Amino acid sequence: MCFSQAETLVNYSFGTCQHRKIFPHFFPSDLLGNKFLPIRGVPHRGPGCYIAEESKDLAYSLAKIPTSIKGYGFGARTAVRFKPKNKDVTPYPGMYQTVNLQEQTHKPNFAPFNTLSPRFRTYSKDPCYPGPGTYKLEKKEPQKVTWPMKFGSPDWSQVPCLQKRTLKTELSTDKDFRKHRNRLAYLSLYYN
């Protein structure tokens, strides 16, 4: 008698009499459920029969987000990581590059030496900064120090010097005098 009941139960596999959550309509709250979302909506409805406003509704987005019932499981998240892009609008030729009324200039943080400086510098028109045509090229200054000479040797009578002293030590005034004399000889190159 026990064997006859066992033979009748063999036709059914374990758990088939109960209502089971199968994948295409239900999903687990882990990594597999986040990757493969279940089918939602009415199965006999065609692709052009959906309402576009329904996809932007709060209730629709809450129903679409996979959530974890028992806290956070391994790989389960409360929201989709990458949201799907809206493909309702077909791009037209002018959509790829938008028209910017204000031209944007991007200044890089680091650049090679002297590449960020302007190409042509702007100089002021002040009379302190003369232009290229304002110089007098007719007058050429001598580049040699003029020194009083007599037959190839210096004319010491025309060179200013101090009176002779019996003491051979050099005083600070003598040193200043020689500095002043040498400066005058140098400046006579440029100013006569």
Curated annotation (Swiss-Prot):
Keywords: Cilium biogenesis/degradation, Cytoplasm, Cytoplasmic vesicle, Golgi apparatus. GO terms for cellular component: ciliary basal body; cytoplasmic vesicle; trans-Golgi network. It is found in: Cytoplasmic vesicle; Golgi apparatus, trans-Golgi network; Cytoplasm. Pfam families: SHIPPO-rpt. One of its GO terms (molecular function) is cytoskeletal protein binding. It comes from the Eukaryota. InterPro entries: CIMAP3, SHIPPO-rpt. GO terms for biological process: cell projection organization; positive regulation of kinase activity; regulation of cell projection organization. Transmembrane segments: none annotated. Interacts with proteins involved in ciliary transport, including ARL13B, CETN1, KIF3A, RAB6A, RAB8A, TUBB1 and TUBG1. Interacts with AURKA. During primary cilia disassembly, involved in cilia disassembly. Required specifically to control cilia retraction as well as the liberation and duplication of the basal body/centrosome. May act by stimulating AURKA activity at the basal body in a cell cycle-dependent manner. This is Ciliary microtubule-associated protein 3. The gene is CIMAP3.
